[in-house]
Amino acid sequence: MTAIQKPVVAKREAPKAEVNPTVSRSTQTETIKPTKERTVSVFSPPVFNFAANSFAQSVSNEYKHASPKRIKLDNSRVQVPSIVKPKQDKPRPPAIVTKPRVINIEFPNKQKSGFKLLIRPKHEPSIKKQKQGIEVLSTSNTKRITKSISVDDVEYVEKVKHAIKQVLPKPDYDDGSLGPVILRLAWHCCATYNKFTGNGGSNGSTMRFVPEITDDGNSGLDIARSALEPIKQKFPDITYSDLWTLAGKISIQEMGGPKIPWRCGRVDCIDDRYVPPNGRLPFAYKNANHIRETFGRMGFNDRETVSLLGAHGLGRCHKRFSGWEGKWTENPTSFSNDFYKVLLDEEWSLGTVPETGKEQYYNKDKSLIMLNTDIELIRDPHFLHFVKLYSQHQATFFQDFANAFGKLLELGIERDSNGNVLPKNEFY
Ligand code: HEM
């Protein structure tokens, strides 16, 4: 029996508080003045606060043995003609972009990390839409890929899959696996899709740029991106967008979930002008209307929505990222229908994460949690119907989840009859 002790009130909070001190919104508009080459400490950078900190955070995950010591800034500004083609229906003004500045990360042992950070300057007045972009790339792949491997290149994909499987186990992280956070990366890079405008979605891998990379909802996903970066270096022919979505599929399967349909061919857009605006990801403090509206915008019905939410049987909330804290189920690295069972069987009462003040639901012994949006699935009668169905029929859940997640990975992607992705001119 489900007993929710507090009456349900659709809680409206002020916009989400910034919980990650290293990612400050204000830095998005920070003007980066060109100066001579200089060295800046990663840990107290005066100007590149966001860039340096978030990058150092990413890199230090993979390179714990050798934390980055210094960042070298090459601040040369060179006027180069844009390689952006004008849109067919709306010709662009002749574009001049400023060459991005390059930051090389040096390690104590003097070896270069193999990464560099490109910081694109604030937009030129003539290009209204262009924002300052921050992109983390491997040095081996500064030429961004606007075409991924072909759907026929099965052998290459198999090698990438194998490499992804190798990075998933991580005994010193959370519950011993990067699977949940990598799955979340795949979901979030697709969840920006807007079926009404046709933009957003995984194609383009726009999460390499601000404002998407600094969207509050994406806090913590640098862990997943940096874990996959060495794979990108080793297999440069796969695009980030293909790699991140493939990694989501493999994570689900490796955690015991169903086989997710996936095809390659996504491209990486060459700059930040197609980054969707913040605010498209679902907000966990909101109600059923918001869930229906957000998933409806992506093209999902109630059944698909409830099946996708079953992924909350995996992983956990982190107060340092979202402000919420705790796991949904007892087995957070094992894909199952436990989320629905727990949601129905436990008694939930509203409480507060002491350190952040964020409200969430706790079960009786406070070992498990639910977010408001999770609880909304049993408050809303239409959602509740599917929660009950999936709690009783794991096979049905697996089938529905595989279909819905496969659909999620394809949002915004058009393919020809051979399965190859049709080019989106605006990306190049
Ligand atoms: C109403 C929709 C949703 C909301 C509001 C929501 C919100 C959240 C929040 C706040 C977290 C905690 C992040 C952190 O602190 O690290 C989280 C984690 C997670 N979410 Fe969702 N989510 C939603 C839907 C989904 C969907 C559809 C999927 C996948 C299909 C998903 C997969 C995950 C996973 C696997 C984690 C755990 C990540 C980890 O352990 O690092 N979520 N979600």
Swiss-Prot record:
Its EC number is 1.11.1.-. The active site is at 188 (proton acceptor), 328 (tryptophan radical intermediate). The record marks 184 as: Transition state stabilizer. Heme b binds at residue 312. Residues 21-32 have a biased composition (Polar residues). CDD domains: ascorbate_peroxidase. It comes from the Eukaryota. Keywords: Heme, Iron, Metal-binding, Oxidoreductase, Peroxidase. Its cofactor is heme b. InterPro entries: Ccp1-like (IPR044831), Haem_peroxidase (IPR002016), Haem_peroxidase_sf (IPR010255), Peroxidase_I (IPR002207), Peroxidases_AS (IPR019794). Binds 1 heme b (iron(II)-protoporphyrin IX) group per subunit. GO terms for biological process: cellular response to oxidative stress; hydrogen peroxide catabolic process; response to reactive oxygen species. Residues 1-33 are annotated as: Disordered. Pfam families: peroxidase. Destroys radicals which are normally produced within the cells and which are toxic to biological systems. This is Putative heme-binding peroxidase.
